[in-house]
Amino acid sequence: MTKQSVVVPEVAVPMPPNSAPLLPYPPPRAAPGVAVRKKYLQAQLDLGAGLPLINGWVESMRASSPTHAKAAAALAAAGAVDDERAAWMVRHPSALSKFEQIVAASKGKKIVMFLDYDGTLSPIVDDPDSAFMSDTMRRAVRSVAKHFPTAIVSGRCRDKVFEFVKLAELYYAGSHGMDIKGPAKASRHNKAKAKGVLFQPASEFLPMIEQVHDSLIERTKCIPGAKVENNKFCVSVHFRCVDEKSWSTLADIVKAELKDYPKLKLTQGRMVFEIRPTIKWDKGKALEFLLESLGFADCTNVLPVYIGDDRTDEDAFKVLRKRGQGIGILVSKYPKDTNASYSLQEPAEVMEFLLRLVEWERLSRARPKW
């Protein structure tokens, strides 16, 4: 292993050209005070900058914690942030209240669904191995897949998220899109080559990821509540159950591990650190790849709909904005800086949106064509 502190540039992976713009988006706007803070925290999370201030890590960890969320909820109940939330909801209205506007945008176009898993189809829980989706949510997703090409795009290992979802007719993109596989079960939406789709742009990093996983298992044994998860093409270090007093120590451990692997980078999700290859591949790239696999790379008659709750989903939201083509929906109860156009508060609202979409499609097909 090398001990260099050299920053390795991300390796670009060729992608199909973007489709022509269809739906012009207004420029994304942050909730008041969010953008400046985000830039500051990102500077602290930038491994290439050497992470000089561990306080930046801890602040970012605290910002994504349930305690922080509860405090925000308490402030909201007291009316302290009502104006801020109202302004945010104007910019990112509920996808349920604007449902007719969303389906109107799909006129003459093929809807393609992209769904995150944790926090979108399943609740956020302390133990990531217990993040089960309900049977009713599974039925809703199955119904959606009967009408629209549907993909699950998750930071989890592809095999693991399939064990949770258990629907063979879907596309699955695990490890933030670095492990993509087509449906194991044919449907009327799948192209002939769909079942053969298998894309793993970071295969060469697998031995390195395995080494980091095994090393962090040992290094984090001194941190009660820390959980290290091997997601095949990335390593996740969960701190949801770690005492806040130990966050700084945990961040130091993870940072120290990365010094031995300059070809890996560090990102952060909801109460989790994620160690990934430095290739330029993320959920946004996965979305583009899947559209190409479905035959929609250069089409103007497609409407991608992406629903997710995590900061890693922002890469997909950004792609939709750049294309000027598609609908990004953020799942969050609180105002966040986002590139999504619409919002839903929780998985229950996601399920309601999916069921309404299925019913709308069913009625549209039954309606006579004059």
From Swiss-Prot:
Pathway field: Glycan biosynthesis; trehalose biosynthesis
EC number: 3.1.3.12
InterPro entries found in the cross-reference section: HAD-like_sf, HAD-SF_hydro_IIB, HAD_sf, OTSB-like, Trehalose_PPase
EC main group: hydrolase
Cofactor field: a divalent metal cation
Keyword set, alphabetical order: Hydrolase, Stress response
Gene Ontology molecular function: trehalose-phosphatase activity
Gene Ontology BP, a term: trehalose biosynthetic process
SUPFAM superfamilies linked: HAD-like
Domain of life: Eukaryota
Catalytic activity field: alpha,alpha-trehalose 6-phosphate + H2O = alpha,alpha-trehalose + phosphate
Family: Belongs to the trehalose phosphatase family.
Free-text function comment from the UniProt entry: Removes the phosphate from trehalose 6-phosphate to produce free trehalose. Trehalose accumulation in plant may improve abiotic stress tolerance.
Protein name: Probable trehalose-phosphate phosphatase 6
Organism: Oryza sativa subsp. japonica (Rice)
Organism ancestry: Eukaryota, Viridiplantae, Streptophyta, Embryophyta, Tracheophyta
